[in-house]
Amino acid sequence: MSTDNGLIIGIDLGTTNSCVSVMENGRPVVLENPEGKRTTPSIVSYKNNEIIVGDAAKRQMVTNPNTIVSIKRLMGTSNKVTVKNPDGSTKELTPEEVSAQILSYLKDYAEKKIGKTISRAVITVPAYFNDAERNATKTAGKIAGLNVERIINEPTAAALAYGIDKSNREMKVLVYDLGGGTFDVSLLDIAEGTFEVLATAGDNRLGGDDWDNKIIEFILAHIAQEHNGLNLSNDKMAMQRLKEAAERAKIELSAQLEAIISLPFLTVTEKGPVNVELKLTRAKFEEITKQLLERTRNPISDVLREAKIKPEEINEILLVGGSTRMPAVQKLVESMVPGHSPNRSINPDEVVAIGAAIQGGVLRGDVKDVLLLDVTPLTLSIETLGGVATPLIKRNTTIPVSKSQIFSTAQDNQESVDVVVCQGERPMARDNKSLGRFNLGGIQPAPKGKPQIEITFSLDANGILNVKAKDLTTQKENSITISDNGNLSEEEIQKMIRDAEANKERDNVIRERIELRNEGESIVSTIKEILQSPEAKDFPKEEKEKLDKITGGIDAAIKANDYTKLKAEIENFKKWREEMAKKYNPNGDQGQPAQ
């Protein structure tokens, strides 16, 4: 595989789903994953020393306790997740390591699609992400073998994708982003190719998954009513199917007024099988999720108030995230910003990745006349006398930026000072997030308040903070670059990179085997559906026997980890399907037996 050192992919590393895009012939193109989908669940499963990412991991989300979801919520923290090894021992993983598995999966299939080795990326983050979270994202990219050229805010990426920078007038743009696991609202000012985030607000514990959960509660209540209080909330297999059915129903209700939830043989009780056949109307769906929708109202008001912008001054509304397809969401946004219909011309699941790819084009020089001016999401301060947090860079300051301020000593003849850096809006340093500290020594003894110590905060375009302290009398100085709060040393990062590289070939083999296993399991499920369908009664006995034989062969191959046999059985099924297609549909139109 050839290497293109100039190629930069754009990655939307989402809480629930991720997406990768690249510039081809001057246009952004979203790349499909091995399952033919344009977005990939941000889910990682660990099973028998295998690492499973994406849709395959999602399918075992409930049944496999070693499945990790929403790892993005832990970025920038010292929290770790624990997984069990086959021998019963446990292993702790940092959020960066888990996120790196997702990024590595995206990188690998992008390389296969493009046919070139990829080493550079632009990755998006929520506008509210702090310095630690941004650093953690860069570290995850590094572990995955990616040089993260730029971290950009998701709303900025969305505006880039919509080409609003091409307008010849200044525009105020509201970006409403309701993803699977988080909700953000941002207000951007765009003029002459320059982007500035004026304000941002949101709820990082609200997303489309919450709408799914309301449907699950609705179904569980129906089951309890119909089956004498039956509670399936602890039945892992049943909950996995309920989760999938709820998501399907939510999607259907965005396009139609009712959805049929059909779950045959959901479980078996003493009285026999439990079958669910339930109609959910859009009106009922909106009723049971009304409180969730209302939680998105205040953040819209907050960003308008903070930016001192009236609703009528908004020029454009952009909807981001698959959950914005829900009609109730669109109605709420229109009601709060009257006179404007939200722009939905780009797939909301893909728009952020597309914007990231365009930013990659900007960095390469392929896209001209675009300047991104993001903002810092929280105030950056130092702790001064009495534990006060004295701000140097205030919240929503445009970055990159550098700010300096003169401080002095708190005691007579003090020969050193501790510089404590914190982040947050609280007036006392102890109530804010501590980012780091360092010591400046060699100060000439003098009465307190006499020495002049210059503190400089420099925040780069990626939101990475460098803090420098300088004694203006002695010219002595010291500095610190704030690293992520996960406390990963460079040695630990390098070890993770080496481990990833050393295991790359093995991981590829494992991934291919997982794909085979997934295909085999999918075929078994398909065969069971065929045999349970009404049309199955018309099948000749020998055809049913063929299917039973294929099913048995696949199950045996999977249990024995015999991937050669598994591949052969998969081919047997494909041949059978082709024969059935010709037999039942000589004109080539595939009918029911070939489904």
Swiss-Prot record:
PROSITE patterns in the record: HSP70_1, HSP70_2, HSP70_3
Name recorded for this polypeptide: Chaperone protein DnaK
Residues carrying Phosphothreonine: 182
CDD domains tied to this protein: ASKHA_NBD_HSP70_DnaK-like
GO molecular function: ATP binding; ATP-dependent protein folding chaperone; unfolded protein binding
InterPro entries assigned to the protein according to its UniProt record, in alphabetical order: ATPase_NBD, Chaperone_DnaK, Heat_shock_70_CS, HSP70_peptide-bd_sf, Hsp_70_fam
Protein family (similarity comment): Belongs to the heat shock protein 70 family.
Keyword annotations of the record: ATP-binding, Chaperone, Nucleotide-binding, Phosphoprotein, Stress response
Origin superkingdom: Bacteria
Main function: Acts as a chaperone.
Record gene name: dnaK
Pfam family, any one: HSP70
Upregulating conditions: By stress conditions e.g. heat shock.
Organism: Mycoplasma pneumoniae (strain ATCC 29342 / M129 / Subtype 1)
SUPFAM superfamilies in UniProt: Actin-like ATPase domain, Heat shock protein 70kD (HSP70), peptide-binding domain
